[in-house]
């Protein structure tokens, strides 16, 4: 089972909870160990967060209209890129009016996938 860091804007915590809930559903093939940060840490959170990200096989970034203002999430995404952690971005919402038209600089040019079981399972399978 792959160890995965889930990056999300704190305003989108319910989406992270939903993704973790999907893996608990016996009818899905989604299986991973959630290593996301659930609560903001103290002033040393970046050091702790970087260590946690480095120990993961991959990161799933949940991208929503809250992402551009989410300094912590943007830092996590940049950290994963800098550390060479395999990254998959998914839209938090599949409705076109809730998708970002312009991605933040740190992830500009990267593909943002639809949030589907197949996309997530394929990503997890690539992690080994």
Please report, for each region that a protein language model flagged, where it lies by residue.
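Inter-motif core of Ras-like GTPase G domains
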Residues: 58-61
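Short beta-alpha junction loops
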Residues: 87-97
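A charged, well-structured terminal subsegment
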Residues: 118-128
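Conserved TIR/SEFIR loop-to-helix hotspot centered on a Trp-containing motif
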Residues: 66-85
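Arginine/glycine-rich "motif VI" loop of SF2 helicases in the C-terminal RecA-like domain
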Residues: 24-28, 79-89
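Short acidic-hydrophobic, aromatic-tinged amphipathic segments that line or gate anion-handling sites
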Residues: 108-118
């Amino acid at each position: 089972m792959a160890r995965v860091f889930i990056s999300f804007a704190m305003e989108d915590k319910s989406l992270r909870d939903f993704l973790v809930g999907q893996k608990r559903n016996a009818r899905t093939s989604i299986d991973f160990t959630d290593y996301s940060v659930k609560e903001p840490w103290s002033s040393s959170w970046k050091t702790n967060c970087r260590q946690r990200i480095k120990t993961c096989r991959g990161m799933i970034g949940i991208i929503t209209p809250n992402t551009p203002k989410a300094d912590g999430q943007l830092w996590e995404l940049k950290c994963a890129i800098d550390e060479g952690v395999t990254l998959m971005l998914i839209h938090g919402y599949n409705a076109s009016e809730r998708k970002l038209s312009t991605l933040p600089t740190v992830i500009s040019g990267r593909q943002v996938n639809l949030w589907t079981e197949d996309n997530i399972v394929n990503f997890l399978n690539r992690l080994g």
